[in-house]
């Protein structure tokens, strides 16, 4: 028994009775129903769709409303749901449509509905937790109103008097907004983002700003997140890749406007050395309009950053033989006089290949001008306060994987051999496989983030390996064929052969083996993102007899034509796990004015035999440990 520990613990309580009260309180909490977890993945900068799914709780808010108000029509449910999703926008819309008296009556009626909804959704939480979910300035009055919302005639006048006074003071709208926010917070308790916040879509920064404000959230890093983290943390190679992808999808505003990164030097460089090429046409999502000059500039910038990326990658491949990336040293395979490249035993013609600054004798070498541009850009990335804040959030809330409430969350894969054995990755004569491999990567990511002044150390280079490496759990293919897709017409060179994991994950025994490696039993599930599920072709996101769920379904508009839907999410509550499929989101304006919602189709993945309690969760295990310590303290209180 650690006497000093228990003496410190005793100092937190005023008396022995206070210890007993805490034991009773924590024990009671352990018996409450498990709170709802919400899983999202591969949101790729699509803020409006992401924000809407957060606000509607993947359809769970409408479900709560139907349970709370069984007498309501579908139209009434939809109208009340919209008020909860977008309270300020809905109130503004109704205010414009209604006369003053009619609007005040609308507010009074809906305020009562929202009070009843809070009472309904909060019934599985302690009163303390519900109280803390209220804005502080409304805490007392809302608690009073909720307690009396269903009161009988004895206290009806008391309740009505409070409402009338609030109406006279003009507080109805503020209370409605506060209640709507509370309902959303209580309906979904915790959010998991299983990777890929960045790239393709226009607003990854707005997504992270939204996540920072959330009370309970975690992130499993995706490959697109890692490459941005690496760009901030000193990797010139990752930085070139980030700029190239932003140019490819017409999203330079993310860099220049959102993060305040000055691109003038590299834009001037691209204009000076490159001509537009068909393969580098920007891929613009529907609705984005650019002038011909703007498209040409993005085209040239994409070409310039691609060549700089290949130069820097060649340097990394040379200094990191452990990475076994020699087959990707593409600049050294080129016959510059013939404009051909030898890949393996085959020779291919290069189409529209421009390399005005490449020295055929030393293709990886940078010119003095390029060295200056890269140094300038690295400084600009490191100097962005907003990007710094976002990377720090990803570091604090993120990891390579998460084991939570019996489930394992990994963005991409766990590298395997064809026989199902864990594939090892050897660095500095140390082999890493399975969970140990992901722990190793996690450790190195944090080393890189701690030292952004380093650009060529092992930790920084491993950030790039996580983007392109065969044994990377975030990539898991033999090669990333960026060069081939740009310059070679023969599409067989574009194929990126996947790690056997992606076939073997259909087998329940393989998933059980992975779960066991991470200390989880066969009652758990593995959740992946990363690979879009092509539902329109009949692909099923539920695999391995329900042990594996893949939830990359196409939040990114660029992929929706391939997938046929606009994303999957998961809800895990005390009754089991539901998979939710979403249709494309239109606009907030349409959602408010017409009550349109992302159509959500739910499918039960796993139903529990007994309703899950808090004691069955990670939080519950912590509480049970605290209770055990408090029981020792209570029993020996006088001794300490």
From Swiss-Prot:
GO terms for molecular function: fructose 1,6-bisphosphate 1-phosphatase activity. One of its GO terms (biological process) is gluconeogenesis. The keyword Manganese applies. The keyword Manganese applies. It is an enzyme of class 3 (hydrolase). Pathway: Carbohydrate biosynthesis; gluconeogenesis. InterPro entries: FBPtase_class3, Metallo-depent_PP-like. It comes from the Bacteria. HAMAP family: FBPase_class3. Belongs to the FBPase class 3 family. This is Fructose-1,6-bisphosphatase class 3. It comes from Lactococcus lactis subsp. lactis (strain IL1403) (Streptococcus lactis). The gene is fbp.
């Amino acid at each position: 028994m650690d006497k000093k520990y228990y003496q410190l613990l005793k100092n937190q309580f005023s008396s022995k009775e206070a210890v007993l009260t805490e034991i009773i309180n924590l024990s009671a909490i352990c018996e409450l129903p498990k709170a709802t977890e919400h899983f999202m993945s591969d949101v790729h900068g699509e803020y409006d769709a992401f924000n809407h799914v957060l606000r509607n709780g993947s359809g769970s808010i409408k479900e709560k409303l139907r349970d709370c108000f069984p007498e309501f029509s579908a139209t009434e449910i939809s109208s009340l749901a919209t008020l909860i999703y977008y309270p300020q926008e809905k109130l503004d819309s109704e205010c414009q449509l209604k006369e003053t008296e009619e609007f005040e009556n609308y507010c009074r009626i809906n305020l009562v509905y929202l009070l009843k909804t809070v009472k309904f959704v909060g019934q599985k939480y302690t009163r303390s937790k519900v109280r803390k979910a209220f804005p502080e300035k409304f805490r007392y009055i809302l608690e009073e109103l909720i307690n009396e919302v269903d009161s009988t005639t004895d206290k009806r006048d008391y309740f009505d008097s409070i409402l009338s006074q609030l109406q006279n003071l003009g507080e109805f709208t503020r209370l409605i907004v506060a209640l709507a926010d509370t309902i959303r917070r209580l309906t979904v308790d915790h959010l998991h983002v299983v990777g890929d916040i960045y790239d393709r879509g226009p607003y990854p920064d707005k997504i992270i700003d939204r996540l920072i404000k959330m009370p309970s959230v975690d992130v499993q890093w995706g490959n697109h997140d890692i490459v941005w983290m690496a760009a901030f943390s000193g990797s010139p190679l990752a930085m070139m890749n980030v700029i190239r992808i932003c140019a490819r999808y017409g999203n330079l505003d993310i860099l220049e406007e959102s993060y305040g990164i000055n691109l003038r030097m590299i834009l001037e460089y691209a204009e000076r050395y490159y001509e537009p090429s068909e393969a580098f046409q920007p891929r613009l999502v529907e609705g984005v309009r650019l002038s011909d000059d703007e498209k040409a500039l993005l085209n040239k910038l994409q070409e310039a950053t691609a060549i700089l990326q290949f130069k820097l990658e060649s340097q990394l491949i040379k200094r990191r033989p452990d990475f076994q990336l020699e087959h990707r040293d593409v600049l050294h395979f080129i016959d510059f006089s013939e404009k051909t490249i030898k890949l393996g035993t085959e020779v291919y013609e290069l189409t529209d290949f421009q390399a005005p600054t490449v020295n055929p004798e030393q293709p990886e070498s940078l010119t003095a001008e390029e060295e200056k541009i890269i140094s300038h850009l690295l400084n600009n990335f490191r100097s962005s306060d907003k990007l710094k804040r976002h990377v720090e959030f990803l570091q604090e809330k993120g990891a390579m994987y998460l084991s939570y409430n019996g489930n394992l969350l990994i963005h991409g894969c766990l590298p395997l051999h064809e026989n199902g054995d864990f594939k090892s990755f050897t660095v500095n004569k140390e082999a890493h496989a399975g969970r140990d491999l992901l722990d190793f990567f996690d450790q190195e990511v944090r080393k890189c983030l701690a030292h952004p002044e380093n650009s060529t150390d092992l930790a920084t280079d491993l950030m790039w390996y996580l983007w392109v490496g065969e044994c990377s759990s975030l990539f898991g293919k033999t090669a990333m064929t960026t060069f081939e897709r740009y310059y070679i017409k023969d599409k067989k060179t574009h194929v990126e052969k996947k790690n056997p994991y992606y076939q073997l994950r259909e087998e329940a025994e393989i998933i059980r083996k992975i779960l066991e490696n991470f200390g989880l039993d066969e009652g758990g599930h593995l959740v992946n993102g990363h690979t879009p599920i092509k539902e329109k072709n009949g692909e099923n996101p539920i695999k391995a007899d329900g042990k594996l769920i893949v939830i990359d379904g196409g939040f990114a508009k660029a992929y929706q034509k391939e997938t046929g839907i606009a994303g999957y999410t998961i809800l895990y509550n005390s009754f089991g796990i539901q998979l939710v499929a979403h249709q494309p989101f239109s606009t907030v304006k349409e959602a408010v004015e017409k009550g349109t919602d992302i159509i959500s189709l739910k499918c039960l993945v796993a139903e529990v035999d007994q309703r899950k309690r808090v004691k069955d969760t990670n939080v519950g295990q912590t509480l049970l440990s605290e209770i055990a310590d408090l029981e020792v303290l209570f029993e020996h209180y006088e001794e300490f």
